[in-house]
């Protein structure tokens, strides 16, 4: 691989943690990665880890050579869906089961039923297998990629490593500028997580940006090119049909999907049905050869609150359901993309209809944004909707950064977007009762109650920022064991007071409730001794 500027990426463990591996039984050489948080109590807490070898101090990172291939990979034996239907627990399924703390048979069954997907192109051996499905932890995707205006290969590789460091489960390369093929090659060869694309973007570049010049042959060849490189899943806007385009005419924001608008322009120019729709069977055959997963695009998603849940959006969703059945008949894995901009009271309906019309294929949503009024804060407006839709059953959330609607995200924006969406995903998992979700909350809450500040930092999603905020006012090392922070100070800390009550109870052989009553009685006597006065004179 060649690049104009050699990429430089962030490496080394996350603060308070180390990289550990568990050997995978039955797959020689395979090791399942975890982020181990070392607690001051002498215990440890292992977390799901997406950062690849970049947080392993013993790993040799050579971006030009790329990451090593994973052990146990078997090529040319069909798709994960076909093998799951045949009753086989693949090496990827076994890896995922160990990673998720779930039975391997559950992984196989969910894939066989089409309710989960394992994006793992035969030609992308560098990835650590992962699963997207509502029975498992909610995943987060981070979009990166250059534009015609800005960015470089080096910057995009750095963003990929940075996003996975903070928890991105997949990456989408949405490059639309120069060197699309080369940028994607660098990302694929160095990505420990699945990589998705939108092939229509590169196809459009090949016809100099004129949608009317697109053909099925140009698109097909672009898809094959990307399959050969190792792209794991592809967004295909095959549900944008000619007859649906007029349904968007009265919308406030029309068609906001880039892929959707490209296909709508082609349909109107030729007054013919979309070549993605009419050639879908052939597309399935190509995907099946490489085990590429469909991410059926919502090209008519609402781009404003006013357009949410309208006729155009749901007409396309019904068509995506039809295409899901066709893809599965070819043994191809499928997930469904969703909105967009949706007010909170309309969010759950999207999940209900997607599951009904699309045979419970994993739902993958962009937010949704719960309001349109906060440019520069859309990582927050969308995380609100993302948490609600995750609780309702969405399997993967596509992050939104503070730069949404404003510009191309930089490194800081990528981290802010990932963290916001890890919060939303985890909140959704807690609400839907994911079996392992609350363990981390309990560990952090216990550390907080016991004033184990360093443990609180290490268990958090962003240890660096948590420590930075604490140290702005209490930077000294003894403050890391103090029983207060700068918010309440030493006398008004509710947790310190609660601990005092418990200490009182232990000292006097009482339970906490008795201790509270005894302490209140003491204060009552003290009040009487001061003449039942609410206000006492100031001490001289």
UniProtKB/Swiss-Prot annotation:
Pfam families: ThiC-associated, ThiC_Rad_SAM. Keywords: 4Fe-4S, Iron, Iron-sulfur, Lyase, Metal-binding, S-adenosyl-L-methionine, Thiamine biosynthesis, Zinc. Binds 1 [4Fe-4S] cluster per subunit. The cluster is coordinated with 3 cysteines and an exchangeable S-adenosyl-L-methionine. Its cofactor is [4Fe-4S] cluster. One of its GO terms (molecular function) is carbon-carbon lyase activity. It catalyses: 5-amino-1-(5-phospho-beta-D-ribosyl)imidazole + S-adenosyl-L-methionine = 4-amino-2-methyl-5-(phosphooxymethyl)pyrimidine + CO + 5'-deoxyadenosine + formate + L-methionine + 3 H(+). Zn(2+) binds at residues 341, 405. Signal peptide: none annotated. Its EC number is 4.1.99.17. Pathway: Cofactor biosynthesis; thiamine diphosphate biosynthesis. Gene3D superfamilies: 6.10.250.620, Radical SAM ThiC family, central domain. [4Fe-4S] cluster binds at residues 485, 488, 493. The keyword tRNA-binding does not apply. GO terms for biological process: thiamine biosynthetic process; thiamine diphosphate biosynthetic process. Substrate binds at residues 143, 172, 201, 237, 257-259, 298-301, 337, 364. GO terms for cellular component: cytosol. Catalyzes the synthesis of the hydroxymethylpyrimidine phosphate (HMP-P) moiety of thiamine from aminoimidazole ribotide (AIR) in a radical S-adenosyl-L-methionine (SAM)-dependent reaction. Belongs to the ThiC family. This is Phosphomethylpyrimidine synthase.
């Amino acid at each position: 691989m060649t690049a104009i500027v050699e990429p430089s990426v962030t490496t080394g463990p996350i603060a308070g943690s180390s990289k550990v591996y568990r050997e995978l039984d039955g797959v020689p050489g395979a090791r399942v990665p975890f982020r181990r948080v070392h607690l001051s109590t002498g215990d440890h807490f292992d977390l799901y880890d997406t950062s690849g070898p970049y947080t392993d101090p013993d790993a040799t990172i050579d971006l030009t050579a790329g990451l090593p291939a994973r052990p146990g990979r078997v090529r040319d034996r069909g798709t994960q869906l076909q093998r799951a239907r045949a009753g086989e627990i693949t090496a990827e399924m076994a890896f995922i089961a160990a990673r998720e703390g779930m039975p391997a048979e559950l992984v196989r069954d969910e894939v066989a039923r089409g309710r989960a997907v394992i994006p793992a192109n035969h030609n992308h051996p560098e990835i650590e297998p992962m699963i997207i499905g509502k029975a498992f932890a909610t995943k987060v995707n981070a979009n990166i990629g250059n534009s015609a205006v800005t960015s470089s290969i080096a910057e995009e590789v750095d963003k990929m490593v940075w996003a996975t460091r903070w928890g991105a489960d997949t990456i989408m390369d949405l490059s639309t500028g120069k060197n699309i093929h080369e940028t994607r090659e660098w990302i694929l060869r160095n990505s420990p997580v699945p990589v998705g694309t939108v092939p229509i973007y590169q196809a459009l570049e090949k016809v100099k940006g004129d949608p009317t010049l697109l053909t099925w042959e140009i698109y097909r060849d672009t898809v094959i090119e990307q399959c050969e490189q190792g792209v794991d899943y592809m967004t295909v806007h095959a549900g944008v049909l000619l007859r649906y385009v007029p349904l968007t005419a009265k919308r406030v924001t029309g068609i906001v999907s880039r892929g959707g608008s490209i296909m709508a322009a082609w349909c109107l120019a030729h007054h013919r049905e979309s070549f993605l729709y009419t050639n879908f069977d052939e597309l399935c055959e190509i995907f099946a050869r490489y085990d590429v997963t469909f991410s059926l695009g919502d090209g008519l998603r609402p781009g404003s609150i006013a357009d949410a849940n309208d006729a155009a959006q749901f007409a396309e969703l019904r068509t995506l359901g039809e295409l899901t059945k066709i893809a599965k008949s070819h043994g191809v894995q499928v997930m469904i993309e969703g909105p967009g901009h949706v007010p909170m009271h309309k969010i759950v309906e999207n999940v209900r209809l997607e599951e009904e019309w699309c045979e419970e294929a994993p739902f993958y949503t962009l937010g949704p944004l719960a309001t349109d009024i906060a440019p520069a804060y859309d990582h927050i407006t969308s995380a609100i909707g993302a948490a609600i839709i995750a609780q309702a059953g969405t399997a993967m959330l596509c992050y939104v950064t503070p730069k949404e609607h404003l510009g191309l995200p930089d490194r800081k924006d990528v981290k802010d977007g990932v963290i916001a969406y890890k919060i939303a995903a985890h909140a959704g998992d807690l609400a839907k009762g994911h079996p392992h979700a609350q363990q981390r909350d309990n560990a952090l809450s216990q550390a907080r109650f016991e004033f184990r500040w360093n443990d609180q930092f290490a268990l958090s999603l962003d240890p660096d920022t948590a420590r930075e905020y604490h140290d702005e006012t209490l930077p000294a090392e003894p403050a890391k064991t103090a029983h207060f922070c700068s918010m309440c100070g030493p006398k008004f800390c509710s947790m310190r007071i609660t601990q005092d009550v418990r200490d009182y109870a232990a000292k006097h052989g009482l339970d906490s409730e008795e201790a509270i009553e005894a302490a209140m009685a003491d204060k009552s006597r003290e009040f009487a001794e001061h003449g039942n006065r609410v206000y006492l004179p100031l001490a001289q």
